[in-house]
């Protein structure tokens, strides 16, 4: 059994240092892998990332993360990456990585994702250059997911880690007028094509916990949605089947 601890939208700052450190300390002995689905900081300052880094230094399990929109706000993502790396956190930006957990290879494809919308409210590849640039950015994110999933096809467990949502299901509860800015269905296309066992994202604070891409489970692990610091998902490493039938999740909070 592989225990994955997942969280998004921690929005760390010096004011939340004690809470964040306590949340990570509580993971000791409870998780085999930690996945952070973006918005680690309040406004993208390296000093805020240091709060996360300090908390992570107490853990001896693999930690993978992607950045979110908040983490990009101050245009200091290179510094944030350095801070996180100093604590052993592997930041994934259109990349993939893997780790060994009890003899099973766990592959993680990580990227921020981007906006674009869903059927009925999707941005087109048409019009002003700025609009087409947005479309191209989402294309690049989707292409990175495709490359990553092909690269980890040999892994026993395959996880996609995003910030923006690839499905409409987990946006239920958010105002429909902002769905376009919460994710894009185009992020789901390579996942449906190449397969995964689990997809995680955040960003949608007022969204819903659970969705799917075909038979592949998708979870919005924003702390505002889960109602806790981390959500623990258990994957049966003895026989993980594509489509995630053996992903066990406790009942989400009402």
Predicted regions and their residues:
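Active-site environment of divalent metal-dependent phosphoester hydrolases
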Residues: 11-16, 41-46, 70-77, 98-101, ...
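N-terminal active-site segment of His-dependent metallophosphoesterases
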Residues: 1-62, 72-79, 131, 135, ...
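Active-site neighborhood of phospho(di)ester-bond hydrolases with catalytic His/Asp-centered motifs
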Residues: 6-8, 34-39, 63-69, 90-95, ...
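Conserved catalytic scaffold of divalent metal-dependent phosphoesterases
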Residues: 10-12, 78-179, 222-223
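Alpha/beta-hydrolase fold active-site loops
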Residues: 2, 32, 106-108, 157-159, ...
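Short, well-ordered alpha-helix to beta-strand connector turns
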Residues: 31, 60, 88, 155-156, ...
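Short hydrophobic patches on amphipathic alpha-helices
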Residues: 27-28, 56, 84, 149, ...
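Binuclear metal-dependent phosphoesterase catalytic core
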Residues: 1, 99-102, 179, 185-195, ...
């Amino acid at each position: 059994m592989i225990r994955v601890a997942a969280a998004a939208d921690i929005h760390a700052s010096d004011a939340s240092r004690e809470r964040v450190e306590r949340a990570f300390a509580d993971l000791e002995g409870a998780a085999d892998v930690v996945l952070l689905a973006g918005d680690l900081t309040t406004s993208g300052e390296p000093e805020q990332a240091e709060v996360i880094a300090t908390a992570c230094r107490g853990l001896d399990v693999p930690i993978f993360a992607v950045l979110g929109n908040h983490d990009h706000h101050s245009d200091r993502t290179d510094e944030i990456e350095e801070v996180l790396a100093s604590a052993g956190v592997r930041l994934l930006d259109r990349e993939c990585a893997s780790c060994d957990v009890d003899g099973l290879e766990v592959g993680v494809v990580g990227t921020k994702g981007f906006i674009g919308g869903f059927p009925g409210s999707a941005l087109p590849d048409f019009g002003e250059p700025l609009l087409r640039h947005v479309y191209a950015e989402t294309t690049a994110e989707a292409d990175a997911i495709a490359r990553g999933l092909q690269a980890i096809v040999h892994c026993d467990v395959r996880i996609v880690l995003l910030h923006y949502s690839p499905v409409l299901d987990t946006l239920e509860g958010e105002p429909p007028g902002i769905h376009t800015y919460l994710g894009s269905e185009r992020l789901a296309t390579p996942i449906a094509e190449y397969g995964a066992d689990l997809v995680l994202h955040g960003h949608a604070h007022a969204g819903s916990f659970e969705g799917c891409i075909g038979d592949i489970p998708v979870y919005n692990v924003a702390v505002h949605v889960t109602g806790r610091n981390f959500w623990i998902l258990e994957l049966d490493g003895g026989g993980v089947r594509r489509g995630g039938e053996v992903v066990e999740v406790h009942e989400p909070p009402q």
